[in-house]
Amino acid sequence: MNLLKKQFVKRNYHKETLKITIDMAWPAIVESFFVAFAGLIDSLMVSSLGSYAVAAVGLTTQPKLLGLALFFALNVAISALVARRRGEKKQDSANETLLTAIFFIVIAAIISSIAFVFFASAIIDFCGSTADTHNDAVVYFRIITGGMIFNCIQMGINAAQRGAGNTKITMRTNVTSNTINILLNYLLINGRFGFPALGIRGAALATISGTVVACIMSVASIFKKESFLSIPYILEQHIRPTLSAFLNLIKVAYSVFFEQVLMRIGFMLTAIMAADQGTDAMAAHQVGMNIMALSFAFGDGLQATAVALIGRSLGSGDPDLAKEYGRTCRLIGAVIAVCLVAIYYFGASGLYHLFFTEDHIVAIGVQIMHVIIFVVIFQICQVIYMGCLRGAGDTLYTAVASMISVTFIRTIISYFCGYVLGWGIIGIWMGVLGDQVSRFIFATVRFRQGKWVKIKI
């Protein structure tokens, strides 16, 4: 608390700015944390089937996220544009953006879903599956991608709601969705209370069921007449999807899309190298990624807050306030990072013992956790600063920075330390650390330069 107070005074933060940031940030943080926590619980429940099952689910993560790259990019554009229009007090333009995005999302999701289901086996094979993981990974991947349209729609609407500052709506949606996911995991993976024991198939069905509920809740949230984003308002004002709105989305999203694709390629190469270390090492790696996702969740929640507040400030013509919101989010993130470092340091062994009874896998996991401790320090702050830049429309810079860091630095260091130096799975995690440090440097330098506040979107 003394550290927080000293930084607060030193940087001349305004109490009102901090209050507004916290009020908007806590629902976004809870939402992101709960999504990551549900992923960790998924792995915990799947681990009851054996380390091969954890590895099988882990194999599907990066190709699934690669398939969602287009939608992640679109979500960044939706949030940034809606936030900017909110600041400009242009409700009609914000709703036009939302409606145009939804139409595009539905078409793109249907096409993507069909392609992933059809090519599932080849994709999983490319990702480094083995005889004991391939079939289960394919089944899981087909179910998840077969229902991706529900996930894509709810992500798009939630992105718009975050841009408008309605973080409590998206929190309720995702907390409900993931609660259903966890409950159905408990019932369907091993078969309880008369439900069939479906194993990995049950885990996938639980995830899809939660996503369907989230989609319904998200759609319902835009049927309120008094909301800034509102279907009744759209009908009343005769708003239609337009080419100009679509082009605005593409203008912001195109560089984010390439950023996402190149990042996912880098992540996938890391996952392939991890899978090459053996099923046990891959299982430990997957749990480590889930634990790291918990720390990312805090940064992601603050990032969503920064996008909304910075977009609104720039839209109303106040770049100094936009910078202050960015610094405030970063300060909160730094305090959270210190707390997580302490938890991960003292709880490393205990966390891995929740997932595995095999001592050699736990030993691998503890070594991974020692790397994650350093990763977290840079990760949360870079995620927030990158979010600030994207929210202002500086997406080309973030794309180049992420490409250099993830696709090249991460991959090269992982290969060198993992194979050339012979450090195995720990060497691969050194690549993860190098990536986070690189992105932190890129993001911090750009944020402090201040050029991003002058970008028009």
What positions do the PLM features span?
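Residue-level hotspots within pore-lining transmembrane alpha-helices
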Residues: 30, 34, 38, 67-71, ...
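Small-residue-rich hydrophobic transmembrane alpha-helices
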Residues: 54-114, 151-170, 282-348, 379-403
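Interfacial/gating helices of multi-pass transporter permease domains
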Residues: 46-65, 132-136, 200-201, 244-252, ...
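Transmembrane alpha-helix boundary and packing residues in multipass membrane permease domains
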Residues: 28, 32, 43-44, 80, ...
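Transmembrane helical elements of multi-pass membrane transporters/channels
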Residues: 23-42, 143, 177, 210-214, ...
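Helix-terminus/linker motif at the lipid-water interface of multi-pass membrane proteins
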Residues: 37-55, 124-131, 187-198, 257, ...
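Short alpha-helical transmembrane segments in multi-pass integral membrane proteins
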Residues: 1-28, 82-149, 197-254, 310-375, ...
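Short runs within selected transmembrane alpha-helices of multi-pass transporters and secretion channels
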Residues: 75, 79, 144-163, 170-178, ...
